Amino acid sequence: MADQQQSPCRILVMASGFGSNFQALIDAVAAGRIRNSKIIRLFVNRKNVQSIKRAEGAGIPWEYFNLISNGFIAKGEKDEQKVAEARHNYDAALAERILSAEEKPELIVLAGWMHVFSSGFLEPVEKAGIRVINLHPALPGEFDGAGAIERAYAALKAGKITRTGIMAHYVIQQVDRGAPILVEEIEWNGEELAELEEKIHSREHELIVKATAKVVDEILEKRA
């Protein structure tokens, strides 16, 4: 089916900070690099972040939903069981907000979303047929989780590895272990940490656009 006969693929973005990857997606959708698609909403979990201004500038609705501010847990709670339960309840409530909306997404893109989802979010979203993808600044199976660039840099300096990279992948409960969508290796030429971080982040914008475009194409083809 031709694009003009199909409704746009509905994308929901989640971001926690500056939102440069979110901006790359906004620009790519506007330019048609991500074909026949529409960013329907932005979710943020931190107040007053630049991502909100980017959404407002593009006319994209946004919503703030936070673990503490929305009453799921008290600030400073240390009890591990209470924290785990609160995170699960928060995740389930966030999934419910998304799934009960009049306009539901077909794809969720985590663009600098600093929160690890539990089954409370992932199971209902998967059951609804919504794909969730993430960008991670490491190669598959290397440096999962937070601080990936710093850990890769330490390994590079120690001579344990000679390159690092970035990947876009599907999100599963195992952190950064979902099936890769696109992977790009990045050579290390002796740069210091700040230079390496800048080098990696400059490549992320292109990778998240290409990966989102690839998944959108698959969604549109499946529809047809």
What are these regions (language model features)?
Residues 1-224:
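One-carbon transfer enzymes
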